[in-house]
């Protein structure tokens, strides 16, 4: 009988019982919501990137295009290679300008090479300096009269 008992134990050890499981449908709303919530940080990062980098760069580009398009004969300019000169010839049909860098020394440069119109910058600087001096004079004269 002991041999039959061992055989029945061996049969019990060799068998694996599989239990039935229920198939539960996955809720589609939860997966859709989790997909949208993971998309929100990416949208925020793009928005920050746009407002901190792309938008200011676009503004600077437009200002530069306006500056280059308004160059006139007789203005003092600075090129991106560091050359100061006075514009002697501007052509609307060509992208070039002629700049006099010394007496009877003229070079051709691209309009896009203009970094600054220094004669305009000087005018603005002089106006700011004058307004500061006027304010100081008013303060000094006001202090002396009292």
Swiss-Prot record:
Residues 125-146 are annotated as: Disordered. One of its GO terms (cellular component) is plasma membrane. SMART domains: YajC. Keywords: Cell inner membrane, Cell membrane, Membrane, Protein transport, Translocation, Transmembrane, Transmembrane helix, Transport. Residues 125-134 have a biased composition (Basic and acidic residues). The chain crosses the membrane at residues 34-54. The keyword Membrane applies. GO terms for biological process: protein transport. It is a single-pass membrane protein. Its main location: membrane. InterPro entries: Preprotein_translocase_YajC. It is found in: Cell inner membrane. Belongs to the YajC family. The SecYEG-SecDF-YajC-YidC holo-translocon (HTL) protein secretase/insertase is a supercomplex required for protein secretion, insertion of proteins into membranes, and assembly of membrane protein complexes. While the SecYEG complex is essential for assembly of a number of proteins and complexes, the SecDF-YajC-YidC subcomplex facilitates these functions. Part of the SecDF-YidC-YajC translocase complex. The SecDF-YidC-YajC translocase forms a supercomplex with SecYEG, called the holo-translocon (HTL). This is Sec translocon accessory complex subunit YajC. The lineage of its organism: Bacteria, Pseudomonadati, Pseudomonadota, Alphaproteobacteria, Rickettsiales.
């Amino acid at each position: 009988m002991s041999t039959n008992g061992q055989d029945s134990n061996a049969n019990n050890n060799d068998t694996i019982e599989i239990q039935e499981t229920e198939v539960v449908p996955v809720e589609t709303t939860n997966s859709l919501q989790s997909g949208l919530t993971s998309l929100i940080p990416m949208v925020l990062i793009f928005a920050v990137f746009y407002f901190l980098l792309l938008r200011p760069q676009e503004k600077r580009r437009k200002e530069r295009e306006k500056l280059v398009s308004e160059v006139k004969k007789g203005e003092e300019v600075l090129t991106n290679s560091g050359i100061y000169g006075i514009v002697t010839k501007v052509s609307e049909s060509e992208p070039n300008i002629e700049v006099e860098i010394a007496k009877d020394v003229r070079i051709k440069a691209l309009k896009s090479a203009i970094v600054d119109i220094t004669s305009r910058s000087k005018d603005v600087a002089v106006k700011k300096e004058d307004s500061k001096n006027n304010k100081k004079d008013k303060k000094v004269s006001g202090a002396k009269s009292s």
